[in-house]
Amino acid sequence: MAYHSFLLEPITCHAWNKDATQIAFCPNSHDVHIYKKDGDKWSKIHELKEHNGHVTGIDWAPESNRIVTCGTDRNAYVWTLKNNVWKPTLVILRINRAARCVKWSPKENKFAVGSGSRLISICYFEQENDWWVCKHIKKPIRSTVLSLDWHPNNVLLAAGSSDFKSRIFSAYIKEVEERPAPTPWGSKMPFGELMFESSSSCGWVHSVCFSHSGDRMAWVSHDSTICISDATKKMRVTSLITDTLPLLCVTFITENSLVAAGHDCFPVLYIYDEAQGTLSFGGKLDIPKQSSQRGMTARERFQNLDKKASSDTNNITLDSLHKNSISQLSVLSGGKAKCSKFCTTGLDGGMCIWDVKSLESAMKDLKIK
């Protein structure tokens, strides 16, 4: 596992380019920094400055090499690289609250933006007018949209929001794509059609994710639950109440395996059993070093109380690689079908790249199916 600390500021969101040689992230500010790997070091090569509010979402299209960003200024920008300079194009989202998340569609001909306006903006490029326009998905969203993920068919869109619901909508835009083929989630897909709505969550839905096939959707909530809906099993929902602090992000790494992370500062593996319809804990992927678990002596305890007016509980350092909450997960190589590497960024200003095979060999009982 390779860990790199970029800054002291928290990393609120990130995105990788196609060959995973460059990473774009927001250091909890109005700007986006782009770093390039140079041997074992990372060097800053670009700084994107256009937003006048905190950047809340970044996505990097692998084929067209365009970056889309959104922020609390209620705007989105599409960035295009010309002569080694990133040029922004403003996208009017027609919202009156902060944008919270953004995702390119698989075919990169549109993108979705979730916001505090209780709606999702589906943005696409109009060739005739030479600008980006958007359509809104509103009903039945009743609160801020916190996370988005596209189905592989480029039409269905998963959304998690702070009204305790995860949903799947049709984001079919007839101007830019052909009529979609039927899926296990449904056959009729006019724009804005609600294909699925969860009822099992009792907390804000922080993250949603489709599997590689698109037949399963997973989500994590602030009540420390992780859930999966399987469209091939009549949209059966399987949930697991975890013993961790709330999870903030989740991704499939195979069709039956998921990695999630959040306030516990380490990634966790979960296994879905299709036959049994169960979700189980697969193991912690960041084992603490036992040598550093030494207790304090009575003398040290009283010295701390005398000098710092603090107890020993305030002086325990985390043994995980990340020293603060993990805010985002992304698959680096192998895709969601058979991930070989994934990346985490956190509020400690650090980024870690995890090698799946190395994790399997380092942990005896770990089996990723």
Curated annotation (Swiss-Prot):
Function: Component of the Arp2/3 complex, a multiprotein complex that mediates actin polymerization upon stimulation by nucleation-promoting factor (NPF). The Arp2/3 complex mediates the formation of branched actin networks in the cytoplasm, providing the force for cell motility. In addition to its role in the cytoplasmic cytoskeleton, the Arp2/3 complex also promotes actin polymerization in the nucleus, thereby regulating gene transcription and repair of damaged DNA.
GO term, biological process aspect, one: Arp2/3 complex-mediated actin nucleation
InterPro entries for the chain: ARPC1 (IPR017383), WD40/YVTN_repeat-like_dom_sf (IPR015943), WD40_repeat_dom_sf (IPR036322), WD40_rpt (IPR001680)
Taxonomic path: Eukaryota, Metazoa, Chordata, Craniata, Vertebrata
Alphabetical UniProt keywords: Actin-binding, Cytoplasm, Cytoskeleton, Nucleus, Repeat, WD repeat
Name this polypeptide is given: Actin-related protein 2/3 complex subunit 1B-A
Repeat positions for WD: 6-45, 50-89, 94-135, 140-179, 200-239, 242-282, 321-364
Gene Ontology terms for molecular function: actin filament binding
GO cellular component, one term: nucleus
Location within or outside the cell: Cytoplasm, Cytoskeleton; Nucleus
Keyword presence, Nucleus: yes
Assembly description: Component of the Arp2/3 complex composed of actr2/arp2, actr3/arp3, arpc1 (arpc1a or arpc1b), arpc2, arpc3, arpc4 and arpc5.
Highest taxon in the source lineage: Eukaryota
Similarity field: Belongs to the WD repeat ARPC1 family.
Pfam families reported for this sequence: WD40
Gene designation per UniProt: arpc1b-a
